Amino acid sequence: MQLLHIDSAITGDQSVSRQLTAQIVEAWKASHPATQVSYLDLVADAPAHFTMDAMAPRTGQTDGLSEAQQRENAVSERLVSQFLAADVVVIGAPFYNFAIPTQLKAWIDRIAQPGRTFQYTANGPEGLAKGKTVIVASSRGGVYSTSEGGRAMEHQESYLQTVLGFFGVTDVRFVRAEGVAMGGDAKAQALAAAAQAIEAHVKAHAANQDRVSQAA
């Protein structure tokens, strides 16, 4: 089993989402010892924002690419191939200004490739990255999930659910720690709830795998 571990928080050791992704990967490896992990730090190794040089190979232009276009295409190919090879993807996605970090959005822009992660058909778009499990470590300084007003400002989990679904990923799970900037007690409670969610998600996946194996 191949697991891709992605972090996108800019705050390093102070990052809650990085703490959570590390816990998720550790729990996953304990439950699935044969798992092989690849790590992608989108801050240390950030893809450039999407440009026409990055877009050029996707428009059917395959011959006569400039050096810049070749470089950008190599970055995109590395990232989309890494994503497609993974059975499980763990994504650290902190809540920045009501959305995700630009580093994470730049990664999504690189892997959103027609013919690779999705295609358009007579019946509409079809995702091509089916069969994956994605676990998102979602961290928020405030609380946005418990009120209509808060949910209206949330473009983090909702966006990731949408774009991953567009790629064909139907098994998307969220480990949420919110209110982590609202005092020590609130942060401790959020982290405890997230730890319980991690345990539940990993156990549920293992139980489902056992059922599939027995049925086979």
From Swiss-Prot:
Which catalysed reactions does the entry list for this protein? 2 a quinone + NADH + H(+) = 2 a 1,4-benzosemiquinone + NAD(+); N,N-dimethyl-1,4-phenylenediamine + anthranilate + 2 NAD(+) = 2-(4-dimethylaminophenyl)diazenylbenzoate + 2 NADH + 2 H(+)
Instruction: Provide the cofactor note recorded for this chain's UniProt entry.
Output: Binds 1 FMN per subunit.
EC number(s) in its UniProt entry? 1.6.5.-, 1.7.1.17
User: Which cofactors?
Assistant: FMN
Q: What GO molecular function terms would the record report? A: electron transfer activity; FMN binding; oxidoreductase activity, acting on NAD(P)H as acceptor; oxidoreductase activity, acting on NAD(P)H, quinone or similar compound as acceptor
Which keywords does this chain's UniProt record carry? Answer: Flavoprotein, FMN, NAD, Oxidoreductase
Concerning Gene3D superfamilies, the annotation shows: 3.40.50.360
Q: Which Pfam families match?
A: Flavodoxin_2
Family, according to the entry, reads as follows: Belongs to the azoreductase type 1 family.
Q: What does this protein do?
A: Quinone reductase that provides resistance to thiol-specific stress caused by electrophilic quinones. Also exhibits azoreductase activity. Catalyzes the reductive cleavage of the azo bond in aromatic azo compounds to the corresponding amines.
Q: What is this protein called?
A: FMN-dependent NADH:quinone oxidoreductase
Species per Swiss-Prot/TrEMBL record: Acidovorax ebreus (strain TPSY) (Diaphorobacter sp. (strain TPSY))
Gene that this polypeptide is encoded by: azoR
